[in-house]
Amino acid sequence: MLDNLKLLFVWAPIINVQIILDGIFVGAVFALSAYGLALVWGVMNIKNLAQGDFVIMGGYLALTLFHLSIPLPIILLIVIIIMFVFGWGIYLLVIRRIIDQDMFVSLLATFGLSLLLQQVLNLFYGPEVKTIDMEMGGIDAFDGMVTIPNSKILSLILAAIITIAVVIFMKRSRMGQAIRATAQDPRAARVLGIDTDKVYAFTFAFNAALCGAAGVLVAMIWVIQPFYGITYSVRNFAIVTAAGLGNLPGVISAAFGIGLFEKYTGMILGTAYEVAAPVSIL
């Protein structure tokens, strides 16, 4: 540990540039699914333990489409649509029945959904780790001490575009306004003529679509595996806990913060502690 600290701040401080960049790339992906969780939690009071599994599912859908030689922008669009429909279906089958139930009911239901998705993905894709091999090259700086894969740059750009689209949608669209009104006071929203059941269904489907988009980016720059969903669920809960519900700027800031925290933890204590770092926030 002491040697790693010396490496960071005395012998090779330029490594901090690599860690900060990696933290930014990580945070951009985390922010998408974390905001979806914040919406579902804030609007419906559902703590979705299957959140990370939605991300992994989106990654596997992207991997399948990539093997069909479909261009990446089209893959992203298709995955978002499929996950939106999937999320709406899960709402009708499961979530709709537990909205007004005790918190532990929602935790048990979504935990069961998480286990089901893990086993289905394992059945279809196997337990091996997989990734989308973009073969895009990268940028080397500071005599090779800092490496930036072009796939990570692309993922950051795509995450920024999606985030801007979400901000515009939530502020300008009627459904976005209905979601915010329902989050503030569901009864008042119903009095004003808002179909809260439709808002709930759309919110959960929208969350699944954001997870799907995050999954595409995860498959591009890391690896996916059927049982990795729990790690993303923990990260999302840590981000939402730090940022608060329905606060997109806060979610983005917390996502970048946790991304940096993870990378520095991995560098100082070892990669075995990297994924465990967000747990300290909960």
Which role fits each region the language model picked out?
Residues 59-63, 80-86, 111-121, 158-167, ...:
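Hydrophobic core segments of alpha-helical transmembrane domains in multi-pass membrane transport
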Residues 21, 43-89, 93:
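Membrane-embedded helix boundary and interhelical linker motif in transport proteins
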Residues 70-81, 204-211, 215-280:
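Transmembrane alpha-helical segments in multi-pass inner-membrane proteins
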Residues 37-59, 100-105, 175-178, 196, ...:
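Short, non-helical or kinked segments that cap or interrupt transmembrane helices
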Residues 4-5, 97-172, 198-202, 264-272, ...:
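Transmembrane helix-bundle core of multi-pass membrane transporters
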